[in-house]
């Protein structure tokens, strides 16, 4: 996977965390540095950790499914993308009690928003991906997106939440199709 695809993938994976961070920002009257750090570290950290775990799960089974790896990557990315698009079309509002930045709440949210990254990590095992670069980009881009989302959410509310998830879903599907086409026609 080339550098620009990793950038797009990182942005797409960060959209769930971006949407949650918008809600967090919406629920806080006054943001402090600790809010930015908590949201950025939890979401960015888990977005980087989960593909790493997924990658090691994937390489465990790589020899068994090497002949269909491109299909697996395509299916995983497409399903995750479709799930994100579906969620973006559901008219969910931000939780008015989303102003919780405690350990349990943030841990649960970080895990929930990074499950997609775990599945993407599995697909990394079948692709030509620089894992260290990928997890660095995923983590740092998610960190930055969440900090921006916290501020935007604090200023503008929930208007952008569903659009972020929709965009993320579309990007994942496009990447899945790109991987499939490259493998079927250009390998």
UniProtKB/Swiss-Prot annotation:
GO cellular component: plasma membrane
InterPro entries given in the database record: Mntp/YtaF, Put_MntP
Bilayer disposition of the protein: Multi-pass membrane protein
HAMAP family (UniProt xref): MntP_pump
Coiled coil: none
Source species: Campylobacter jejuni subsp. jejuni serotype O:2 (strain ATCC 700819 / NCTC 11168)
Function: Probably functions as a manganese efflux pump.
Protein's recorded name: Putative manganese efflux pump MntP
Residues passing through the membrane, by range: 3-23, 35-55, 56-76, 107-127, 129-149, 166-186
Family as reported in the entry's similarity comment: Belongs to the MntP (TC 9.B.29) family.
Keywords linked to the UniProt accession: Cell inner membrane, Cell membrane, Ion transport, Manganese, Membrane, Transmembrane, Transmembrane helix, Transport
Compartmental location: Cell inner membrane
Main location: membrane
GO molecular function, one term: manganese ion transmembrane transporter activity
A Pfam family it matches: Mntp
